[in-house]
Every structure is written in structure tokens, then in C-alpha cells.
């Protein structure tokens, strides 16, 4: 069989697509919203998405909270804010999606703060 030589970018894109489909199917089966974390060097975002209805239920970010950057302390504030918004809408259990980022630093700080505020994932 002929070996296909993919570039790293193509491999990463294929892996991301597989993970997206896997998380989407997991959410559809569990009827739980997905907490999606997106980060850049400057800021961090968190969205609560329901794939059943294709809508965003709640969102929070370091930009929305008028924070200067997305460091660990501000990531904790975003985590607490998204947890409060999710609990206000009646969602206690969510599926955590870190968009392929490593679970450390700002991602971990946001996740821990959301757990402490009452979310389960």
C-alpha cells in the first residue's frame, strides 16, 4: 500500500477534526452542553455550546470582563463567570473541550475555578 506523506499541519487538522466529531457525538449522546475553551497569547475565552440546538448558551472572556490580559488570575475569573452563567441556566454537568491545548497553566486555572464554582466535568 502506498504511504501517504502528510505535513504536520494536515495531521493536526485531521486530528482536530476527529476530536471535534468525537466530542460532538459524546455531547449528543449525553445531552450535556460542551464547555469550549479558546486561548490566544493575549486573551482567553469560554463558551457553553449546545450541539443539539446549535446555539451558544453562555460565554465569558477576558475581553468581555475588561481584563487586560488572559493570565492565570484572569483565567480563574473567566472560569468563575462561565460557571455562574451555566448554573443560572440550570446546567451543572458539562463536557470539557480544551481545543487541543495542553491541560496546564491558564487552561487548568480556568477549569479548576469552574469546578470550584460548582460545574462538574
Swiss-Prot record:
SUPFAM superfamilies linked to this entry: Translational machinery components
GO biological process, one term: translation
Protein's name in the database: Large ribosomal subunit protein uL18
Taxonomic source organism: Ureaplasma parvum serovar 3 (strain ATCC 700970)
Function, in words: This is one of the proteins that bind and probably mediate the attachment of the 5S RNA into the large ribosomal subunit, where it forms part of the central protuberance.
Subunit structure comment from the entry: Part of the 50S ribosomal subunit; part of the 5S rRNA/L5/L18/L25 subcomplex. Contacts the 5S and 23S rRNAs.
Family listed: Belongs to the universal ribosomal protein uL18 family.
Keywords for this protein: Ribonucleoprotein, Ribosomal protein, RNA-binding, rRNA-binding
GO terms for cellular component: cytosolic large ribosomal subunit
Key word Mitochondrion present: no
Single GO term (MF): structural constituent of ribosome
Record's keyword annotation contains Methyltransferase: no
Amino acid at each position: 500500500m502506498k504511504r501517504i506523506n502528510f505535513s504536520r499541519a494536515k495531521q493536526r487538522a485531521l486530528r482536530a477534526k476527529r476530536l471535534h466529531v468525537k466530542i460532538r457525538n459524546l455531547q449528543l449522546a449525553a445531552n450535556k452542553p460542551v464547555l469550549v475553551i479558546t486561548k490566544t497569547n493575549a486573551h482567553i475565552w469560554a463558551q457553553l455550546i449546545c450541539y443539539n440546538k446549535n446555539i451558544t448558551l453562555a460565554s465569558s472572556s477576558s475581553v468581555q470582563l475588561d481584563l487586560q490580559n488572559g493570565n492565570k488570575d484572569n483565567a480563574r475569573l473567566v472560569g468563575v463567570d462561565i460557571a455562574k452563567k451555566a448554573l443560572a441556566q440550570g446546567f451543572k454537568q458539562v463536557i470539557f473541550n480544551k481545543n487541543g491545548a495542553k491541560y496546564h497553566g491558564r487552561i487548568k486555572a480556568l477549569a479548576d475555578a469552574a469546578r470550584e464554582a460548582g460545574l462538574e466535568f
